[in-house]
A protein has these predicted regions:
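Hydrophobic transmembrane alpha-helices and their helix-loop junctions in integral membrane proteins
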Residues: 1-173
Length: 173
C-alpha cells in the first residue's frame, strides 16, 4: 500500500521525485509503484476496497497535480493518479481488467519515462522546474517539445496513443 502511494501513505512520492536525479526519477517511475501493483495483482485481485482506493488515488493525484507549479512534483502527482487507475483495475479483478492494468503499467513506464526525461532536459537547459518561469521553449528545444507532447497525449488517453488503449481496456472491464 505504501509503495503503491495510496493516500495517506503516498505522501513520500511527490517529495522523492524532485530530490532524485533525472535517471533516478525515471527508474523510480518505472519500477517502484509498478512492483506494488504487481504485488496487489498477486495478493488481492478482486478486492472491492481496491476499487475505492483506486478512485480516491486517481482523484487525489489529479487535483494536486493541477495545483502544482513544480514540473517534477506535477509528474509525481500524476503517477499517483495513474497508479490509481491500475489499483481500481486490480480491484475489479476480471481478466480484462487485469490485462488492462498490465498493459497500462507497461505504457505508463514508457510515457512517464519520456515525460521525466523531457522535464530533465528542460531543467538542465533552464535551471528551473517552475512552470510559471518557463515559456517559449518550443523555439529553443523543439525536439523536447515534440517528445513531451507525445508523452502528454499518451498520459491523457488521446486516441491512437498507448495510454488510450490501456486505459480503455480497464474502463471497458
Amino acid at each position: 500500500i505504501v509503495n503503491a502511494a495510496v493516500p495517506p501513505f503516498g505522501a513520500w512520492l511527490p517529495d522523492a521525485y524532485p530530490a532524485a536525479t533525472v535517471t533516478g526519477a525515471v527508474f523510480m517511475s518505472a519500477f517502484t509503484t509498478k512492483t506494488a501493483v504487481y504485488a496487489l495483482i498477486r495478493i488481492c485481485a478482486g478486492s472491492e476496497i481496491l476499487i475505492v482506493l483506486g478512485v480516491v488515488m486517481a482523484i487525489y493525484g489529479v487535483v494536486y497535480a493541477v495545483l502544482e507549479n513544480d514540473a517534477r512534483r506535477l509528474l509525481a502527482y500524476h503517477i499517483i493518479s495513474q497508479v490509481g487507475y491500475m489499483v481500481a483495475g486490480v480491484g475489479l479483478g476480471t481478466q480484462m481488467a487485469i490485462n488492462g492494468v498490465v498493459a497500462h503499467a507497461f505504457c505508463h513506464i514508457l510515457y512517464k519515462s519520456l515525460l521525466f526525461m523531457g522535464t530533465g532536459s528542460v531543467l538542465y537547459m533552464t535551471g528551473t522546474a517552475k512552470l510559471t518561469e518557463l515559456g517559449g521553449l518550443y523555439k529553443t528545444m523543439p525536439r523536447t517539445m515534440i517528445y513531451t507532447v507525445i508523452g502528454g497525449l499518451s498520459i491523457s488517453s488521446f486516441p491512437l496513443f498507448s495510454g488510450f488503449v490501456s486505459k480503455s481496456m480497464t474502463v471497458t472491464a
